[in-house]
């Protein structure tokens, strides 16, 4: 590179002008950095103004990410395989035209592509539970739970007594069920999880596992395998969109009816997917609506606001887990069910 280009001006560098040249170089560097910043900012602004970053279809991973040991052990204990379980739920969906019609209708109500719901159903019944030969089994179980008398709580403390503790007073400002229960879950994590408070020792476990699973830990039910806390969070959206009654944490049987009745369960499933898509748009600036593997991953993991925030902080595109990978890998076959 010539001297005249090096110093940024159309003059040769004098022998004793090294300091001056270095000064010019620093100025040039600042100007270039400023220009780069302006260009980058403009590009980001244009991209945001023109829409969101569209997450493309397909898997980011060439091979399926590792399946958790718990899922492997459950499947092995059931003397079956993941391939067998996948084929079982696929065949159930293929043979139940009424269910597919309900999936399509519910998806339309929530403004999502029905393939997202198919992906969530397939993922749940491949990795978490076995599919039932007949959908009516869910109706029978729903009726059985509705007839039982039980409550949400921990030990002798009901959920209502627990929420009356002063630590939860700040959550009283939220009227929307999603914001309200997200706040309460945050208080649990910060002030109670794994701690001894007011003479009670609380487990180092999730809020939903400690207070909202009166039968056994890891409890989810119904076609969409929704847990009670998730249903309570989505209650307002489902009430507005589908017209089902709002849920009350003090009426546990009604909550279980909502997540086990197939029709109601579909509404909560769709609401959960809708929430994940909205969270990634508003928090991470990402449109994940064309990648069922990503929405399936979030349906499996939960925590879409936290995950969207983490993605926004680190940059890049979201990646599917083992559960979402299967959905994308089988996408053509799953789309044929619709």
Identify the residue ranges that each predicted region occupies:
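Acidic/His-rich structured neighborhood in mature extracellular/periplasmic domains
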Residues: 114-121, 125-233
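Alpha-helical scaffolds flanking conserved acidic
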Residues: 112-119, 288-298
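N-terminal export signals and maturation junctions of secreted/periplasmic proteins
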Residues: 49-104, 129-158, 163, 251-261
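N-terminal signal peptide c-region/cleavage motif recognized by signal peptidases
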Residues: 40-44
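Bacterial N-terminal signal peptides that target proteins for export
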Residues: 21-33
């Amino acid at each position: 590179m010539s001297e005249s280009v090096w110093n940024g001006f159309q003059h040769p560098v004098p022998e004793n002008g090294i300091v001056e040249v270095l000064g010019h170089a620093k100025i040039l560097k600042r100007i270039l950095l400023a220009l780069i910043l302006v260009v980058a900012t403009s590009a980001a602004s244009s991209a945001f103004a023109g829409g969101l970053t569209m997450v493309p279809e397909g898997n980011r991973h060439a091979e399926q990410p590792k399946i958790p040991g718990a899922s492997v052990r459950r499947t092995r204990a059931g003397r079956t395989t993941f391939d067998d379980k996948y084929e079982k739920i696929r065949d159930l969906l293929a043979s139940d035209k009424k269910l597919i019609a309900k999936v399509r209708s519910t998806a339309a109500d929530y403004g999502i592509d029905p393939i997202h719901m198919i992906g969530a159903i397939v993922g749940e019944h491949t990795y978490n539970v076995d599919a039932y030969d007949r959908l009516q089994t869910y109706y029978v179980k729903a009726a059985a739970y509705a007839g039982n008398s039980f409550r949400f709580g921990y030990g002798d403390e009901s959920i209502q007594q627990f929420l009356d503790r002063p630590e939860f007073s700040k959550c009283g400002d939220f009227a929307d069920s999603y914001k309200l229960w997200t706040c309460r879950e945050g208080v649990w994590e910060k002030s109670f999880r794994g701690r001894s408070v007011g003479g009670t020792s609380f487990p180092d476990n999730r809020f939903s596992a400690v207070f909202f699973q009166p039968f056994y830990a890891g409890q989810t039910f119904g076609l969409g395998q929704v847990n009670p806390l998730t249903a309570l969070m989505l209650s307002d959206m489902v009430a507005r969109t589908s017209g089902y009654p709002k849920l009350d944490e003090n009426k546990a049987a009604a909550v279980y009816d909502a997540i086990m009745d197939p029709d109601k369960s579909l509404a909560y499933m769709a609401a959960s997917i809708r929430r994940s898509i909205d969270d990634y748009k508003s928090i991470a600036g990402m449109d994940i609506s064309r990648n069922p593997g990503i929405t399936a991953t979030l349906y499996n993991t939960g925590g879409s606001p936290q995950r969207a925030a983490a993605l926004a902080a680190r940059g890049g595109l979201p990646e599917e887990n083992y559960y979402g990978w299967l959905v994308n890998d089988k996408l053509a076959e799953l789309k044929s069910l619709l």
